[in-house]
Amino acid sequence: MGRTYIVEESVGRYLSSINLQGKTFVSGLLIGQCSSQKDYVILASRTPPKEEQNENLEHPKAKLDNLDEEWVTEHANQVSRMLPGGILVLGVFIITPLEMGNDFQNALRRLVFAVEKTLSKKRLWSFTEEEVSERVTLHICSSTKKIFCRTYDICDPKSSAKPADWKYQNGLSALWISFECTVHINIHIPLSATSLSYSLERNTKNGLARWAKQIENGIYLINGQVKDEDGDLLGGQKKSFKGNAQAASHCFDVRVLTQLLLNSDHRSTATVQICSGSVNLKGTVKCRAYVHSNKPKVKDAVQAVKRDILNTVADRCEILFEDLLLNETPEKKVMKKEFHILPHRVFAHVAGSTVMLCDYKFGDESDEEIKDHFLEMLDQKIQIKDLEIAEEINTGVIAAFAVCSPCCGYLLSLLQ
């Protein structure tokens, strides 16, 4: 038996409202949350059209090659930055005027694998063996209104399509459980002489991977308590929520305790390497995560928070490096020491849901630009007055880059 996708009714209305307007197809992303029993789809977002794109009314089958994998995967990459912990890209949808054959299904298969491959490259974490590895493709025929829902196991390159159920539900995420966490980071990434041949971005990502292990191995206090990860998150509480007062109480505060010293049973040896510079990240980040309200486990909450911490730091660094590349001056060849403020996080509600999506904002960007970005990437109209700035400017993360001559210092590293 295939997987079941429980879908917010507003997603169905959104998909039905998409007008092909002479195009041979419209593609997009399906966004939500996985669980062991079923998956939840809370949002769909069409792929933004390319500026130079000029569709005509040729027969759809002649246009299969126009399914631009690179464009769709870049959209998925941008959207993934806007998702809080626990929310991810579940798959892709495509709307066509006609029912299509096997060639088209093969194109969809390639697309869903390409999206997952792109997203996995940037993650500082990996899926566990227990997690669902199936991703969904949804094909809607606009003329017959037929829906073809199939899944593929993205861990198996030879995976074949499996049929899946697509069921709508009103108010799906209206009472989901939210988690808020403030993390103070102070990450020092030394640059050895041998690592200078790599880009600063690559060196930073390698350093973040080491920091990620601290976050993965941390102790997580939920409302000040350490809970059994296999226990029910809402153990001892009412299972049904009636009224906003009870629903509002299900926002948990999470604190992270990371290990500073090695345990006594860990043996280590010290090595000395020539240090040619360093990258330092210091400041405070605000994290949010969401879990469905269908008998969630403590481990579901902890995992969602962990991943939001890792994602938001990695995404901010990636955005900063993209900005530096765009604004690079040709005459600037040697960097001695620089300070940059990483972009701040801004949240906005999804209509009819407790879930808030996010974006990142540099100090010189306007709220209007953030509003436009939500519309372009997520096809979501938001009000500027509803934007919630997560971090104040004076508490955000500052990145300090210092690249010196190869003989200016030494790196002492502990090897376990």
Where are these regions (language model features)?
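N-terminal beta-strand/alpha-helix entry module and adjacent surface
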Residues: 1-88, 96-199, 203, 207, ...
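Active-site beta-loop-alpha substructure in enzyme catalytic cores
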Residues: 92
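C-terminal functional modules of predominantly eukaryotic multidomain proteins
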Residues: 155-416
